[in-house]
Amino acid sequence: MHNVIIESNLDNLLNNEYDGYQAFIYCRKGSCILTYNEGRHEMNGDSCAIILNKKFLKDIAPAPDLECEVIYIEESFLRQSEPRNPYIIQGMLALYSYPVIKLDKEGTKLCNALFQNFKLRIENTQHKFYDDILRTSIH
């Protein structure tokens, strides 16, 4: 499998082949209930979710009208890419409790731009600095 996988549905979110990947989900439209870390979390249009560890994800219940994009990033690749930040533990703990983030208008615009930019960069596999570009695009 690849370091980074982009999909436009949640079909593989519970797939064992994707163990070892973190999932970054951008919900464009519709809704989905995630049962994660003993809580039920609802994603709606213009929200995003970050699933740090899939073993805590017990169930997903997408509505029929759900439109989303998912970026799966292999954890080892992500670790090589992340900046060394002493506050990262606090952020990770918060995401285990509240994986869904409701976006305001500006946040929606930025999240959409980030996902589109990442998709453009991942398609350019022949670029001399492909891995470096992917790593810097993650953050």
Segments (PLM) and residue ranges:
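N-terminal regulatory/effector-sensing and dimerization cores
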Residues: 2-94, 127, 131
